[in-house]
């Protein structure tokens, strides 16, 4: 893979990690609002939706790390 392609891919991956974590933060904020208003069960249910975007952000980070190593190995 060419160096420029790797750098472009890393930039896109990092942007997507930001999107996924922003989504998780929005979900957490909604869950917090629920529990602050006494809807504990609803807050827990809402918070369960955090798992997928965090999982996806983690896998994207794995990909970015791999591409970073590939880029370093090209030097």
Region locations from a protein language model:
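Alpha-helical linker/edge segments of TPR/alpha-solenoid repeat scaffolds
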Residues: 3, 69-75
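Short, charge-rich amphipathic interface segments used for partner binding and complex assembly
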Residues: 30-71
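N-terminal acidic leader/helix
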Residues: 1-34, 62
């Amino acid at each position: 893979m060419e160096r420029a392609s790797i750098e472009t891919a890393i930039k896109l991956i990092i942007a997507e990690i930001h999107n996924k974590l922003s989504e998780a933060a929005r979900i957490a904020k909604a869950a917090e609002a629920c529990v602050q208003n006494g809807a504990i069960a609803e807050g827990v249910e809402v918070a369960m939706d955090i798992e997928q975007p965090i999982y996806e952000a983690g896998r994207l980070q794995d990909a970015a790390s791999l591409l970073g190593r590939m880029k370093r190995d090209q030097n």
